[in-house]
Amino acid sequence: MRAARARRLVSLVTSPARLAATLALAACAGASTSGRVGNAPVNVPRYGRLLAMADARRVDTALIHEILRAGSRPERAAAALAIGQVHGTSLAPTLRALLDDPDTAVASNAAYALGLLADTGGVAALAHALAAPPFVAHNAAWALGQVGEPARAALVTALAPTTAPHDSRVRSDLLLATFRLEPVPVEAVRPWLADSSALVRWSAAYAIARPYAAAGVRDLIPLATDTSGEVRAQVARAFSHRAAGDSLAALVRAPLTALARDPDPHVRINAIRSLATYGAPGKAAVVAATRDPDANVRIAAAEELGSVLDNTRAAWMSAWKADTGFMYRRSVLVSAMSQDVVLPAAEIDEPDSWAHQSDWRLRAAVADAGGAAPTILRLREISLPLARDPDPRVRSAAFAAMAPHADTAESHPWRREFMEYGLKDPDFFVRATAIGSLEGHAAADEVPLVLASYRLAEADTNSDARVAAVRFFVSAWKRDSVHFADSVVAALRALPVPHDMLARDAADSVSLFESWRRAPVPDPRPSAWYENIVRTRILPALGGTLPRAEIVTERGTITLELYAVDAPLTVDNFLTLAAKGYYDDVRFHRVVPDFVAQDGDRRGDGNGGPAYTIRDELNPRRYERGSMGMALSGPDTGGSQYFLMRAPYPHLDGRYTVFGRMIGGWSVLDALVQGDHIERIRGS
């Protein structure tokens, strides 16, 4: 398994950003905590001020220009990146000029920052930068994709076989940029499906498969037998009925069925998902996959059974018995419920039902299954009793299952009941879920109840319920402000300014919370803290010593290398939590076949965290197989949860902080299933 996985994309391709960093490290060899990197002295206090600026999301134009004019190479590169991180649109002209900077690290970060800004005024400059060294062209191509439609002509021109860059990595980035266009320029992508580079073929296939571009499906048929498993996986995805439609269904079904028997489990997973979109014609392959030797393939098949099986109970019982694993059976339970088949494990009145087991995960699974029920009546029958469960994680699952229906006309009779229990729950996330589910039809007469819930949430260590309540107030004000009682308006305006910026940001769009906007934003931390990050995290990494960490699981050990220059605050946060034992004796609470393995929640249901949030540190690292990212519930909501990529997913680039990569333990990553135990994480 390890040898086979070593041939995956992460090993076939060295990330241009990673290569750029490697060469930059070589050029800057000799760093020490004295603040000198090679012959270029790093001004530690000034670098610390830059970190503080980015952390506070403030644009300090004077500081940026000072660093760009007289700073060391690492400082200048970081300053260019920070402009994009703080959404410094006023400095877009500065970034465009930096595309010609003689330091390729600066120019490359400038290109990436223009992408974060989606700078339409920079299209010509970015297109010109495609002729720059690969380090720069790599991010210029990505940035053009972020700009989107205004960059279409530039992307199509750059992909013409007679003018395309020679570097296969830059070609790859150009192709990946096109999947963000609607429609995808298939004519420009098509020639690269036959390229000699597996990376280029994969990128071209991804550009068609990710957005389900129907115009390119026929062109992918020859690639169903490609030598690269990564390419075949994208072909399997593209053969979904969503892309192929009825007109090409007969043409792709045979190769798709063959891909469901592919030696690579990642390919089989995508093939099974696509076959399920055809309904009954895909039944045999999907059902057969429930007995696949790979656990993740079995789980993926179980998740799709609702698309291929009807409500014949015997077929569902057969599927249930195919595997005894928790995640497999949970998936069968949910799929069966979508066909209004209530398996014994979900029978609320049965004493042996999962709803009555001591393991909270089993009870939560029943609540989750209720959310898939085709009728409100069935949903209430299954999930509502579990909304009174003694465990907040089960109650949270129950309210989450009911949440999509709480704002509909059909659910109106029990909306008030939902508010009565959910808004008073002692658990912060139950309250957050309940409030969030009601936001769409927020009314003035409901604000007092939510205001009472907000006051309860002021004592929470987590901000979720406070933020949800503020969003409810804003929604109600926009929909129904004329019916707000004067006393309610006065009470809302008298609320203390929240300490957490997430709640303040949520209120930014209405005059009701004008005082919050005027309130000063304190520096997140003292300057000495940021300077210490520079000395202890950034300078050693610039000198070539990247921090490492090990995730010791029940299936083996995963070894990580952390990007302390690209995401210093995130890396420091992760290593600090690990040193405190925060990640000891927990489980992977979310594992999605062929996507991610996620951990970092001691609560265990995906809703927990360390009682604080950290800012995003978006950077040019890409989401390849083995990349490590910070999990979010929205911008700047990171904390302790992280995820490991089981396959490359470029659509995540620029949306979540990449702060590390795997350098060992590939077979462990492939074997993980949801619920697997983590003994400990330790950094070095």
Model-derived features with residue positions:
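Cyclophilin-like peptidyl-prolyl cis-trans isomerases
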Residues: D427-F429, D445-S684
